[in-house]
Amino acid sequence: MAPTELPVREMKLSDGIVTLSPLRLDDVEAHLSGEDELLVRYLNGGPGTREDVEAYVRHCREQWEAAGPLRAFGIRVGVDEVLAGTIDLRFEGERLSPGQVNVAYGLYPSWRGRGLATRAVVLVCGYAASEGGLEAVIQVEPENRGSAAVARRAGFAPGRQRLSTDGARLDRYVRNLRSALSE
């Protein structure tokens, strides 16, 4: 299921506290500054370099413009929309059934513990539902208790444990997206 094409520059989701908008090249420095051991371990797969992060942001922009299966948002806070982290939706991917959408997120250290990731997940679930997603899936390594807590607070229920293609155990959390349209 491919999402519909949206104007990249105009895309914003907000609940009045958190604003989600597509990643852009001027986010690269803030992302590199905010990256820590937890983001590297659980989300990024390795420390970012300027070249790698710029290439990823360009890829994300191309996905938005081509209505591809990836939707990568910056999690922004405050009037100035300071970058606090990222959240990605994948409408296709490893071990996803038709209609399922993978949600992956991470906050920079100074923004953790404020409920921002939960708000971002709720916002992105509404967007995924509006794009035809039927069920959201969050895949978390068992020792990543913070991400599991975000999933539960955002209305996800524990699903079956799975193995990733590299053999890592992942706890799956799932949420029916029908109710997300009304949030």
Placement of each model-derived feature along the sequence:
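Short amphipathic helical patch at the helix-1/turn junction of helix-turn-helix
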Residues: 107, 141-142
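Conserved GNAT acetyl-CoA-binding A-motif
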Residues: 131-140
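Ser/Thr-centric signal marking residues that sit
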Residues: 86, 118, 140
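GNAT-family acyltransferases
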Residues: 1-110, 127, 131, 157-160, ...
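Conserved acetyl-CoA-binding loop-helix of GNAT-fold acetyltransferases
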Residues: 105, 113-130, 145-153
